[in-house]
């Protein structure tokens, strides 16, 4: 038993070529790509638990933070540090990376253990996001910073341009919680101020409070979005102080 990377490369040559076409990057060293696609469950079944994609995932996580951060810095010179941080967090979190992985059908190319495969592991966000980071790590080891930057330019920046405000909003509540916990060891509260309109077209107004002070008020068609909008305004107020 054991993982023969050369044999896996030979066996998966057609898959690798298909994957390279999807990401528009051709590997110099296919061993790096193959290692990025080996999930820990497969390595464990082959009695070589250490020969999985986790080390490349570690590299990819750090590289993605750097490359996405630099791309945002260059693209949005008007943005403050806090906004850049929140936007980067929204782009490199598990949910968004899993979405990016699904767009290139990454799950299909993974080597999974039988148990994980049978439990729909190819569809799990945790597995897909980690594998995506591992692929980024492999590209960095193979082609360096510029190769990863080209991938970010191709796949991430179009999303940013279309959904910048949505991405910032989606992360606002968790970011506000982190800011207040770090500064005051205490989180915010949310107060429903108004609810109006028919059941199919409700409008909610929600205020964000901290120690009885209103930091921001959001209005939207759902409570969740109103809270996020209020939290985003609260963050702007805190950052301007």
Swiss-Prot record:
Subcellular location: Cytoplasm
A Pfam cross-reference name: Ribonucleas_3_3
Alphabetized SMART domains for the sequence: DSRM, RIBOc
Function: Digests double-stranded RNA. Involved in the processing of primary rRNA transcript to yield the immediate precursors to the large and small rRNAs (23S and 16S). Processes some mRNAs, and tRNAs when they are encoded in the rRNA operon. Processes pre-crRNA and tracrRNA of type II CRISPR loci if present in the organism.
Active-site residue numbers: 61, 133
PROSITE patterns: DS_RBD, RNASE_3_1, RNASE_3_2
Complexes and interactors: Homodimer.
Organism of provenance: Desulfotalea psychrophila (strain LSv54 / DSM 12343)
Recorded GO MF terms: double-stranded RNA binding; metal ion binding; ribonuclease III activity; rRNA binding
E.C. no: 3.1.26.3
Family membership: Belongs to the ribonuclease III family.
InterPro entries: dsRBD_dom, RNase_III, RNase_III_dom, RNase_III_sf
BP GO terms, sorted: mRNA processing; regulation of gene expression; rRNA processing; tRNA processing
Cofactors demanded by this protein: Mg(2+)
Protein name: Ribonuclease 3
Start and end residues of each RNase III domain: 16-144
GO cellular component, one term: cytoplasm
Keywords, ordered alphabetically: Cytoplasm, Endonuclease, Hydrolase, Magnesium, Metal-binding, mRNA processing, Nuclease, RNA-binding, rRNA processing, rRNA-binding, tRNA processing
